[in-house]
């Protein structure tokens, strides 16, 4: 059984469907008691996964072999409430790790962000580059990374960290809060208005990676030991401007 925290979100929903299609048993953790579940995920077990509630986390981790931890505040939410960002992204990850260890989970895959390297990202970056998080979103993800690395070092659980760049693709749920992302915004404008207007700096360089590639990477991490105890940048390796 694989538990996906945040499994009804933009990326989590796509990963959940991909795992289902790959014949994994999937349990989705949600902070909501009655979430809106896309039709593609109706066969999944849905459980409460409140990152501040240790009992709900232990219940979510029962009979689970691996966890994909995606639940977090986004960049805008972190900027608006840095204290909540620390409690959810940072300490919430620690709470889930502790529940996972207590319930015998063997593998913990944490989705972090390439923004831990700095903002804006500059130069050639690899996994040996020194992290320099510059805003609350990156700072709290970096903190969570350290908790995962600590648990892995203590041999309490096998932890892996995936530092994601800009994943692009359609959501399972059209109501998902993902339409402010630049590629999604342009696609939505085209569909609704038959025109596009760029609302961000056209000179900013970005690395885009298809969500389908992210999903296949997750399967590789779950089914092999190639990234056990490791940090990996999940990116295309190609920088583009708009």
Language-model features, listed with the residues they occupy:
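Glycine/proline-rich active-site loop of Rossmann-fold NAD(P)-dependent oxidoreductases
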Residues: 142, 155-157, 167-184, 194, ...
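N-terminal Rossmann NAD(P)H-binding glycine-rich loop of SDR-like oxidoreductase domains
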Residues: 2-22
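Conserved Rossmann-fold NAD(P)-dependent oxidoreductase catalytic core, especially the SDR/UDP-sugar
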Residues: 94-136
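SDR active-site strand-loop-helix element
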Residues: 5, 29, 67-71, 108-113, ...
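NAD(P)H-binding glycine-rich loop region in Rossmannoid oxidoreductase-like domains
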Residues: 45, 51-88
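Active-site Tyr-X1-5-Lys
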Residues: 119, 134-160, 165, 191-192
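Glycine-rich NAD(P)-binding loop of the Rossmann-fold in SDR/ketoreductase-type enzymes
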Residues: 52, 84-95, 131, 135, ...
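N-terminal Rossmann-fold cofactor-binding loop
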Residues: 29-33, 51
């Amino acid at each position: 059984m694989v538990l996906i925290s945040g499994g009804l979100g933009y990326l989590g929903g796509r990963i959940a469907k991909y795992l289902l299609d790959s014949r994994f048993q999937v349990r989705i953790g949600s902070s909501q008691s009655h979430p809106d579940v896309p039709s593609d995920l109706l066969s999944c077990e849905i459980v409460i996964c409140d990152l501040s509630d240790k009992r709900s986390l232990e219940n979510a981790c029962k009979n689970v072999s691996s966890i994909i931890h995606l639940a977090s505040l986004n960049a805008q939410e972190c900027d608006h409430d840095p204290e909540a960002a620390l409690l959810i992204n940072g300490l919430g990850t620690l709470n889930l790790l502790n529940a996972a260890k207590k319930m015998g989970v063997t593998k913990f895959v944490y989705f972090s962000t390439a923004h831990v390297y700095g903002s804006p990202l500059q130069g050639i970056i690899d996994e040996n580059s020194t992290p320099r998080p510059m805003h609350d979103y990156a700072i709290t993800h970096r903190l969570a990374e350290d908790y995962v690395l600590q648990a892995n070092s203590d041999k309490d659980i096998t932890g892996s960290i995936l530092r994601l760049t800009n994943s692009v693709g359609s959501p399972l749920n059209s109501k998902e809060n993902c339409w402010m992302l630049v590629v999604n915004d342009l696609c939505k404008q085209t569909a609704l208005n038959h025109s596009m207007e760029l609302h961000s700096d056209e000179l900013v360089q970005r690395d885009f990676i298809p969500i389908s590639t992210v999903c296949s990477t997750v399967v590789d991490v779950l089914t092999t030991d190639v990234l056990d105890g490791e940090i990996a940048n999940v990116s295309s390796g190609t920088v583009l401007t708009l």
